[in-house]
Each structure stands twice: as structure tokens, then as C-alpha cells.
Amino acid sequence: MTLEEFINQWQSPSPTLLVHTSGSTGKPKPMLVEKRRMEASARITCSFLGLKRGDSALLCMPLDYIAGKMMVVRAIVWGLQLIEVSPCGHSLKQIDTPPVFAAMVPMQVYNSMQDDDERQKLWQIKHLIIGGGAISDEMAAELRLHPNAVWSTYGMTETLSHIALRRLSGPQASEWYEPFDGVNVSINADGCLVIDAPTVCALPLTTNDIAEIAADGRRFRIRGRKDNVICSGGIKLQIEEMEAKLRPYINVPFLISKRSDPKFGETVVMIAETNDIESLKTICKERLNKYEQPHKYIAVDSIPTTETGKPARAKAMEIAQTH
């Protein structure tokens, strides 16, 4: 979708817009969202960040998904100067002057950190929000040194982008997400986060994210997804936690997945962009406990991802099951 096409949709008399989920756990799903709720979400973010009318805002994500659409809505609602570049892994290469405000996915931030010119521009952004994927411990440690405000976002298409932020830069850096005013969270019987955000979502939303709520009853942190649990021989293993243990030691793209097994119920499978399986086995033996050890290693040309760069877990499970 082009910027002109989206603005035409936005300016149409219809009170709703058709959007699609990212497809990280399966096929992208269509859903209708209310424009007034998108406007409300935009105001909440811009107000929280302290953005001013006329501030520059970088649009570097596809307009097919909610993250890109919301950047345009923020610019319209708050009077920001929108700078559009083609969505790619090196968005900052396309601009000369760093924007005041930018929203990026972790891959774009990572790529910019590897290039001296891009890194310099990244460090001059006044307000940077990062969403659409996990932020590694290594990236978080680097971003802690960023001189301005950098945030990790928590949200989804159903909440019209994010409903909570956690600080990544400076002494205020935290692993806990702080919900916006008017947003309340709780945990259900399955340990999953429930979001009550009436401004942007008409009904309370039960997520698939296994979460922990802080003692203050407001802040929360995410452990992983309910559908990313491997139940192997009666032991529950969280895929994201296993990947986090391995990420500092494996220098090729990889994913942990699972396959059904007649003896254990489910077993751990590692999918990686390498044929050096023995090295992977050595690292796993050193860094994972005995229950977490992969039963199978699969070499692939490329790790399956969605159009927004998230791991395509459903596709990975297909690979794990059929190879």
C-alpha cells in the first residue's frame, strides 16, 4: 500500500479501516478497526513522548500493517512532519537529517548499529520506539548508552499498536513495561496477560503472552508466548527463554521449534542457517539444561519470517514436523 492510498482510505467517510495482523503465529488475519480509536492511540503515544507540532517523524515500515499506518495517523493527528522512506533493513541510509521521532523494528536498529554513518544518525534520534520483535540482551545493552529516549513497545494489531512502553536507554532502563494511563493489566488462569484498554479496544483482550506483573500491580514483563511452550515428557519449556540462552553464542540465524513425538509428546527442534550441526550441538550442551536439548537439528537456507520480520513460528513448526 502507498502513502497516498492510505491517506485516501483515512479521509474516506467510512468510520473503520481494514487492517491485517502480522501473521507471526499463522496466516495474517483481516480485522476492521475504528478510526476514532486509532486517533486516540496516536494522541496517547505523542503525548507520552512529549512530541511537538512540526516535529519530524520517520515512516520506514510497510503501510500494509498497523505499525506503519499508526505512524501516519500520529503525523496527521499531532501535526508532525512525516518523512517517508522505503521500508528496508537500512532505512537511515535514505535520509540526511535524523528525525525527531522514529519507530523501527529490531532488525532495522541492529543493521543501523553495524554502519558508522547510520549509527551516528540513530544516536541523534530524540524519540525512538522499537517494536515488532524481541530485543536481544546485546542490543538492549548497547541501547542503554543511547543519549536520548529509546523505548521497547508492547502491543499488537488488536490494540492498535502499543499500550505499554519500557525504557531501554539511560539510568531508567528497565525490563518492565509501563502501561499508559487508562490501561490495566491482569493475569488469567493460564498465566497469560489480559489487557483492559477501553480507549483503543472495546473489550478486554486476552493475549497469548505469558507474563508476570510487578508488585505495584501495573508494570509487567513478558516471559514468552503460550503457543511457544514445548511440553516434553511432562516438562514445560519456553521457546523464547531457550533462544535467549543461546543467542549470544550462535552467530547464524536460528529458531527453536517443536515436533510431536510418540514417547515425549513433543520434542525440541533447532532450525538454523548452517550445516555445522556439531558446533550447534556443542553450544546447546554447554548452555541448555538436559530437558532443553534439541532432539533434532535442521539446516535451512533461510529462517522463515513474516513480512514484518518476526519469526514465522507456524511455518517453522511445519519444517520441524516434516524434515
Show the residue positions of the predicted features.
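Conserved pre-ATP/AMP-binding loop-to-beta segment of ANL
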Residues: 3-20, 53-56
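AMP-binding/adenylate-forming
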Residues: 32-40, 56-111
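Gly/Ser/Thr-rich phosphate-binding loop
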Residues: 115-171
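AMP-binding/adenylate-forming core of the ANL superfamily
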Residues: 184-212, 218-219, 273
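Conserved C-terminal "lid"/linker of ANL adenylate-forming enzymes
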Residues: 257, 269-271, 283-323
